[in-house]
């Protein structure tokens, strides 16, 4: 199965992508992981991407597309993959179509995890991270035993600047503006299956599994 997993920031997409890839016995391909691998290995593409990242600029599509194509061309992708974080725009989706056609592959499903914005904001704004060990808590859903202190090491818990409400709202607005045309692109081809991401994690996992089964 060749699958794209979509979902807004805070939807638990990364976790579900790893679980789905494990269930299917196929690789989980995250663009974040690809970027880090190329940059840490100092590949020509990695060096080019690093120049943009270090300058605080958006990495151009041709660089991102080339990195993704390099990964999809590896033998373990022949029988399937779970793409996480790509494509983000219809332009990238068209580039992906060309890559897959060249490689003799085709998409089977686009799974969209849908979560109300209010819940995504609540999840992010309530998140707290330990300064010492990096453990993550939530003031409502997973609070520490002692407020402001890590259960594991006693370190101070803090709110990341990215988790402030204004910044979360900006990320969500950007996601929606990019994703609406992308979803339409795939809906016109009958590939999109939407699951509710505002349920317990196990139920979301089960619904994704059913969506994949229905796409075979």
Swiss-Prot record:
Keywords: ATP-binding, Cytoplasm, Kinase, Metal-binding, Nucleotide biosynthesis, Nucleotide-binding, Transferase, Zinc. ATP binds at residues 10-15, 127, 136-137, 199. Residues 30-59 are annotated as: NMP. It is an enzyme of class 2 (transferase). It catalyses: AMP + ATP = 2 ADP. PANTHER family: NUCLEOTIDE KINASE. Belongs to the adenylate kinase family. AMP binds at residues 31, 36, 57-59, 85-88, 92, 160, 171. Zn(2+) binds at residues 130, 133, 150, 153. GO terms for molecular function: adenylate kinase activity; ATP binding; zinc ion binding. Catalyzes the reversible transfer of the terminal phosphate group between ATP and AMP. Plays an important role in cellular energy homeostasis and in adenine nucleotide metabolism. Its main location: cytoplasm. It is found in: Cytoplasm. This is Adenylate kinase. Residues 126-163 are annotated as: LID. Consists of three domains, a large central CORE domain and two small peripheral domains, NMPbind and LID, which undergo movements during catalysis. The LID domain closes over the site of phosphoryl transfer upon ATP binding. Assembling and dissambling the active center during each catalytic cycle provides an effective means to prevent ATP hydrolysis. Some bacteria have evolved a zinc-coordinating structure that stabilizes the LID domain. Its EC number is 2.7.4.3. Pathway: Purine metabolism; AMP biosynthesis via salvage pathway; AMP from ADP: step 1/1. GO terms for cellular component: cytoplasm. The lineage of its organism: Bacteria, Bacillati, Bacillota, Clostridia, Eubacteriales. Monomer. It comes from the Bacteria. One of its GO terms (biological process) is AMP salvage. It comes from Symbiobacterium thermophilum (strain DSM 24528 / JCM 14929 / IAM 14863 / T).
């Amino acid at each position: 199965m060749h699958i794209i997993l979509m979902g807004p920031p805070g939807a638990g997409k990364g976790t579900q992508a790893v679980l789905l890839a494990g269930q299917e016995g196929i690789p989980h391909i995250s663009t974040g992981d690809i970027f880090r691998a190329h940059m840490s290995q100092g590949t020509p593409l990695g060096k080019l991407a690093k120049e943009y990242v270090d300058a605080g600029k958006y990495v151009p599509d041709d660089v991102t597309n080339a990195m993704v194509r390099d990964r999809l061309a590896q033998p373990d992708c022949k029988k399937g993959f779970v793409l996480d974080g790509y494509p983000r725009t219809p332009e990238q989706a068209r580039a992906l179509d060309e890559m897959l056609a060249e490689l003799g592959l085709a998409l089977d499903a686009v799974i969209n995890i849908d979560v109300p914005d209010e819940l995504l904001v609540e999840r992010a704004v309530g998140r707290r991270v330990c300064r010492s060990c990096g453990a993550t808590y939530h003031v409502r859903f997973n609070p520490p035993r002692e407020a402001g202190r890590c259960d594991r090491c006693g370190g101070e818990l803090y709110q990341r600047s990215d988790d402030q409400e204004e910044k979360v709202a900006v990320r969500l607005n950007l996601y929606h503006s990019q994703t609406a045309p992308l979803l339409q692109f795939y809906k016109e081809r009958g590939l999109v299956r939407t699951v509710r991401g505002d349920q317990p994690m196990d139920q979301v996992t089960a619904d994704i599994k059913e969506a994949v089964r229905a796409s075979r």
